[in-house]
Amino acid sequence: MGSNFHYTIDLNEDQNHQPFFASLGSSLHHHLQQQQQQQQHFHHQASSNPSSLMSPSLSYFPFLINSRQDQVYVGYNNNTFHDVLDTHISQPLETKNFVSDGGSSSSDQMVPKKETRLKLTIKKKDNHQDQTDLPQSPIKDMTGTNSLKWISSKVRLMKKKKAIITTSDSSKQHTNNDQSSNLSNSERQNGYNNDCVIRICSDCNTTKTPLWRSGPRGPKSLCNACGIRQRKARRAAMATATATAVSGVSPPVMKKKMQNKNKISNGVYKILSPLPLKVNTCKRMITLEETALAEDLETQSNSTMLSSSDNIYFDDLALLLSKSSAYQQVFPQDEKEAAILLMALSHGMVHG
């Protein structure tokens, strides 16, 4: 009878395919040693009888395990090695039978004495359990409850902020709309009231005009024509007022001007005018020149008269001295001539 062994292996690694060598403890090793002894016995039989077939050496079987699958069941006996997987596995794993020198093996031809079966059950924990053991990161792991709560709190805060901003903006818009509506309503009411007021010109009593002007009764109390007419009248009145003011100031000025003219005509203020000054200066220069000429003539006449008189006087003096006997006795002839010359020199009669 055959013996079955069941082993369970947990896989917690993320590798896709891993080579696994089935050395599963002391008990498994003990059974494998028994199987090796049986295989050696078959080898001796094959050497003695070459027609007999030899069993495969199945001490350690390398096989591949897909860690992505949930459970892997491995069926083991001394003839075949099959992998029984779940229904979602498309292609089952098959192991090769190792045959000795040139022999062919089949399950029908081999008849072992003892049949041993080894059943391996490989289980992999769920992602949820693995992720709960590991530290949770809110960005990479999106399946954890704590991370979901943390992210949801952030999202809630952001949503609250957005909601507050939107509510504030909406309230501001509502207030602006209310203010604009109130202003428009007030403007409409004021315009309606202004339109309803019937204006009458205080001058011509008209009610239709393109433009209302200010008048003596206040703003917009005159029509356009009356306002222009009254404005012209005001300007004319202002011009006449300025003219009368100028006329009230002008008579004394004119009187002063006439008096000045009269004074100039009378000769009192002739010196002030520039033309009489020039004439007077010319006249004075002429008179001065005339007086200078007259004086020169007088001096010349006087000098001639004096010279003639001196000459006459000198001649008379010479005659008198020549005739006097006393003068002749006192002064000799040389001295007489010298005295006459000195007298002549003193009177300027002799010119050298």
Curated annotation (Swiss-Prot):
Segments of this protein annotated with the region Disordered: 27-53, 163-189
Expression induction or repression: By light (including both red and white lights). Levels follow a circadian and diurnal rhythm, with a peak at 20 hours, thus preempting dawn. Activated by gibberellic acid (GA). Induced by cytokinin and derivatives (e.g. benzyladenine, t-Zeatin and 6-benzylaminopurine) in light conditions. Triggered by nitrate. Negatively regulated by AP3/PI. Strong accumulation during cold imbibition of nondormant seeds, but not at warm temperatures. Regulated by PIF transcription factors. Repressed by HAN. Inhibited by SOC1. Down-regulated by auxin (2,4D) and auxin response factors (e.g. ARF2 and ARF7).
Compartments, as annotated in UniProt: Nucleus
Ranges of biased composition (kind: Low complexity): 33-53
GO molecular function: DNA-binding transcription factor activity; transcription cis-regulatory region binding; zinc ion binding
UniProt-listed SUPFAM superfamilies: Glucocorticoid receptor-like (DNA-binding domain) (SSF57716)
Reported tissue expression: Expressed predominantly in leaves, and barely in stems, flowers and siliques.
Any one of the GO CC terms: nucleus
Domain of life: Eukaryota
Record field: compositional bias (Polar residues): 165-189
Disruption phenotype: Pale green leaves and reduced chlorophyll levels associated with altered regulation of sugar-sensing genes (e.g. HXK1, HXK2, STP13 and PLT6). Reduced chloroplast size. Faster seed germination. Early flowering. Increased leaves size. Reduced gibberellic acid (GA) levels due to increased GA turnover and associated with reduced expression of GA-anabolizing enzymes (e.g. GA3OX1) but increased expression of GA-catabolizing enzymes (e.g. GA2OX2). Small seeds with deformed seed coats. The double mutant gnc cga1, lacking both GATA22 and GATA21, exhibits reduced sensitivity to cytokinin (e.g.
CDD domains: ZnF_GATA (cd00202)
Signal peptide coordinates: none
Function field: Transcriptional regulator that specifically binds 5'-GATA-3' or 5'-GAT-3' motifs within gene promoters. Involved in the modulation of chloroplast development, growth and division in a cytokinin-dependent manner. Repressor of the gibberellic acid (GA) signaling pathway that regulates flowering and modulates greening, in a SOC1-dependent manner. Prevents the accumulation of SOC1 during flowering. Promotes chlorophyll biosynthesis throughout the plant, by regulating chlorophyll biosynthetic genes (e.g. HEMA1 and GUN4) and chloroplast localized glutamate synthase (e.g. GLU1).
Protein family (similarity comment): Belongs to the type IV zinc-finger family. Class B subfamily.
Name of the molecule in the record: Putative GATA transcription factor 22
This protein's encoding gene: GATA22
